[in-house]
């Protein structure tokens, strides 16, 4: 992946490349993400941003998965995320009512959209800070986080997600249309195929592999018919980071749209369970 972020920003912002420093961000599976730092800070008022900033985050979305270039991946994912960042920004004119949760829970953050270059497939958003760590890494770090910090963050996250699901439950077709949100159904289908194909590879040689993978396919199709809501869809531990102020930051809204309450809670719960077992604090008899 050799997209030239420096040249792109230099042309867009009309500043010399020497004022831009690019730092690759780790963890991206489907997109390439970088932090661009500016000396001096760059003026973004022409994009509706109220102030100059020392840094921004950019995401480039090629028509394939960045970590597996041989796997095609619809670039509509970036259009979905760009629209989601507007809908979830409580200061946006197009904000959804549920965006008020970011005001109600000020310790829960999400990036704000600065600019979306549809032709170049580049998304520019606010930087939530360089001193961030994913929630799974934060929970197992040494020395461990203070119990009161863990309790506060867990409470804020649980209440925020619970209220988000309730506030967006059973979204109507009319509402989804009014959101002007690209449909995430195609991406979900691609994701299901990717999971099933990987499962077949992992289970090669296992008896009844076709029966097992068919059950996974059926479950992926059927569960979305129940408990519908709006959601991140891809809600897991790597999409939740903790910054230096111990705020929760929710990242990667590229699947945002019609979802399922059980999926939203179950996927995240599964990853927290894996974190729990990785701590080696339970015995096989417990």
Indicate where each model-derived feature is located.
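Conserved NTP-binding catalytic cores of kinases and kinase-like/nucleotidyltransferase enzymes
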Residues: 1-121, 243-248
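Short, flexible/disordered intra-domain loops and linkers
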Residues: 65-77, 140-145, 278-285
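Conserved kinase catalytic-core helix
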Residues: 87-91, 131-178, 223
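Active-site activation/catalytic loop segments of kinase-like enzymes and analogous catalytic loops
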Residues: 83, 263-286
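Short Pro/Gly-enriched beta-strand edge/turn motifs at strand-loop
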Residues: 13-20, 213-225
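Active-site catalytic-loop/activation-segment of kinase and kinase-like phosphoryl-transfer enzymes
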Residues: 159-221
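Active-site acidic catalytic loop and adjacent metal/ATP-binding pocket
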Residues: 29-48, 56-57, 216-264
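Conserved short submotifs of the Hanks-type protein kinase catalytic core
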Residues: 120-132
């Amino acid at each position: 992946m050799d997209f030239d972020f420096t040249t792109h920003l230099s042309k867009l912002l009309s500043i010399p490349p020497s004022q831009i420093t690019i730092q690759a961000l780790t963890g991206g599976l489907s997109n390439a993400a970088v932090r661009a730092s500016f000396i001096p800070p760059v003026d973004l008022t022409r994009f509706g941003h109220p102030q100059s900033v020392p840094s921004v985050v950019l995401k480039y979305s090629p028509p394939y998965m960045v970590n597996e270039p041989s796997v095609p991946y619809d670039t509509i994912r970036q259009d979905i995320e760009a629209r989601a960042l507007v809908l979830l920004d409580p200061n946006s004119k197009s904000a959804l009512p549920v965006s008020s949760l970011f005001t109600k829970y000020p310790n829960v953050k999400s990036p704000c959209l600065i600019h979306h270059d549809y032709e170049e497939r580049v998304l520019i958003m606010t930087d939530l800070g360089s001193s961030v760590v994913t929630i799974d890494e934060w929970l197992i770090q040494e020395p461990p986080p203070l119990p009161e910090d863990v309790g506060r963050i867990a409470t804020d996250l649980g209440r925020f997600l619970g209220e988000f699901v309730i506030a967006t439950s059973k979204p109507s077709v009319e509402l989804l249309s009014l959101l002007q949100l690209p449909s995430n159904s195609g991406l979900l289908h691609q994701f299901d195929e990717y999971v099933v194909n990987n499962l077949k590879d992992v289970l090669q040689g296992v008896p009844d592999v076709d029966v097992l993978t068919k059950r996974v396919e059926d479950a992926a199709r059927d569960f979305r018919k129940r408990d519908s809501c709006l959601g991140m869809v891809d809600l897991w531990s790597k999409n939740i980071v903790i910054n230096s102020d111990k705020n929760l930051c929710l990242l990667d809204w590229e699947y945002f749209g019609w979802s399922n309450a059980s999926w939203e809670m179950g996927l995240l719960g599964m990853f927290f369970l894996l974190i729990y077992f990785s701590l080696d604090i339970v015995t096989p008899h417990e």
